[in-house]
Amino acid sequence: MKLLVTGASGLLGRAVMQECTRAGHEVIGLAFSRVSGALVKLDLTDAKAIHGLIQRERPDVVINLAAERRPDVVERDPVAVKKLNVDAPAILAQACAALDPPAYLL
């Protein structure tokens, strides 16, 4: 199965990628601020980039682990946090639904 993991540079994202790879899945990791190694840099607030990547890679499953969880950042920039925590998952859902067959979004 082909999996796409957002937030792949985080603690949970790295662990999920490792376990999915160990289970024999093809895994594509996405990150934005701490991109290294085989991770793909993607701005999840860029709808066009999200749709393009999902159309190009055609994953079976997208595992969304990207989020801003620090309260001080939420208070300092609630608009940016909403884009990542609310708007980006909606865009991911639309992009997954546009595939034929559609990808599952977790």
Regions picked out by a protein language model, each given a short descriptive name:
Residues 4, 28, 82, 106:
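Conserved beta-strand positions in the Rossmann-like core of class I SAM-dependent methyltransferases
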Residues 1-23:
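N-terminal Rossmann NAD(P)H-binding glycine-rich loop of SDR-like oxidoreductase domains
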